[in-house]
Amino acid sequence: MGFRVFNFCIQDSPRRAHSIAAQGGINAAKNYQNDGDSVYRLFYDTVKGGDYRAREANVYRLAEVSNNIIDQCVAQGVPFAREYGGTLDNRSFGGAQVSRTFYAKGQTGQQLLLGAYSALSRQVNVGTVKLYTRYEMEDVVLIDGRARGIIAKNLVTGKLERFAAHAVVIATGGYGNAYFLSTNAMACNCSAAMACYRKGAWFANPAYVQIHPTCIPVHGDKQSKLTLMSESLRNDGRIWVPKKLEDAKKLQEGTLQGKDIPEEDRDYYLERRYPAFGNLVPRDVASRAAKERCDKGFGVNNTGLAVFLDFSEAINRLGKDVVAQRYGNLFDMYEEITDVSPYENPMMIYPAIHYTMGGIWVDYELMTSIKGLFAIGECNFSDHGANRLGASALMQGLADGYFVLPYTCLLYTSPSPRDRQKS
């Protein structure tokens, strides 16, 4: 769009951005399944799932451009899953009663990131973008109250360098690593957002932190982070704990295995409490319910802080090959970490810090309280209220980057009619 862009990342390549860890999918209101989805329904589900605390104008725009995101990504070559006839496949996610989530097995974030990286590489090749890897932003340069560049540290040489610009865009994710353990990569340190805050950018809703219900439980004293298991597993997996406290005690002592507990002694507590949604309740509901069961003594691992996510019924109904096709890489990851096969035994999961709905305050045009400083994706506060729906993080990041920021930033950097009159 005519911009010359300096792109900075703290990693050795943009391909190592934490979006690569997003597994389950990306939402869009395409209604390919003809199950009643629409732009308005996606808007409503997002606002309701966020406890009515999101900025509704931003959310409606997000729902409107969601369909364009899928078209853009397909054009970039992102290998979304397809049905037998060749049409794009969908699945359901928590907080929705329609199938609107597009996915690429359990690697959706990775494939979307590679699609975006290929487009970035093309712009680097033609000279419109210059890439700076292994740089950490230290400060925002303000001139007459407007963002006019940054100070960044070269992490290879240790030198501080300055870069001038007409506008600055922050797209650095959330602050989940403020907690001792989270699912965030260690590079997600919130240093860029904090630098903006120190310069006077407003921060909004910092208390809104999402606790994801399906993470591998803590299994050692020397962990630096927790591992996410995709919410998409709740499509076919069933969450349960024993009905009897004595069975829970045996599980915690290691004298009983989950697969040996008969069906009549299992409490599928989400299906029992929320029959309309079943296991696909919103994340905050599933996390609170799991903690409540464990606090009552029904936890299933040696710490008592885990519940079962069981695929035995899905394997019997669909066959092992179909389940492996949908979730094979996630099962492999789980087995690599825990040395337990989800095909043979129920997975153990427990809630963990995952996503931050709060962030830098932005207006409708994604500009912060500092003129010329924009914040997009997870590092702003605008779209998810008090709780994000599953598969909406990728949707927001791509909507902001592909379909909102190019136009709002262009509007900011272009001469105004008043400027033209003066000239």
Each language-model region and where it sits:
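Glycine-rich loop(s) and the adjacent beta-strand/alpha-helix scaffold that form part
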Residues: 167-222, 384-407
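Conserved redox-cofactor binding core of oxidoreductases
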Residues: 74-159, 171, 215-229
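Glycine-rich FAD pyrophosphate-binding loop
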Residues: 3-20
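Core beta-strand elements of the Rossmann-like FAD/NAD(P) dinucleotide-binding domain
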Residues: 158-166
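Glycine-rich active-site loop/strand segments that organize a redox cofactor
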Residues: 28-61
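Conserved small/polar residues in nucleotide/adenosyl-binding loops
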Residues: 412-419
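An anion/pyrophosphate-binding glycine-rich loop and adjacent beta-alpha core
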Residues: 195, 202-336, 407
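Short FAD-binding loop at a beta-strand-to-alpha-helix junction that anchors the flavin cofactor
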Residues: 369-387
